[in-house]
Amino acid sequence: MAMPVLAANDEWYSYIKINDMTIILEKDQANIKVNYTIDPGTQLIVYLLGKQDLKNKLLKVLNYEDATVKNVEMNSAEIQINDISYDYGKGIYWFPEHEFNVVIPNLRVVSPQVSREYRNTKKFSDGMGFFDR
């Protein structure tokens, strides 16, 4: 069943509006926690028909290949991505720039050394280097 995309609003993807996202970097892996709102008119349909379409739409929003949905609820999800960072050896990693398919109102990227916060962005620009210790 195809669901129409809501009005031209960069924060919505179909029936999902992203509220905030946290990306926690650990070596070449990322654990992503995303909080969102489901359009009230669609909540019952998602509840009755299951969350597979919701999972697919969240993966489309993130725009990462080979992501794994670890947990999905009606207002949040946990997603894991392996091989997301470049490993330069000796505990040195590079998390490259990335573009999402919607505007993220509050994006937080956390490495073992630093936490960066972005507002109303569709792109994590410039990338970020970090160490595994």
Regions found by a protein language model. Give the residues of each.
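Lumenal/extracellular ectodomains and adaptor appendage modules
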Residues: M3-R133
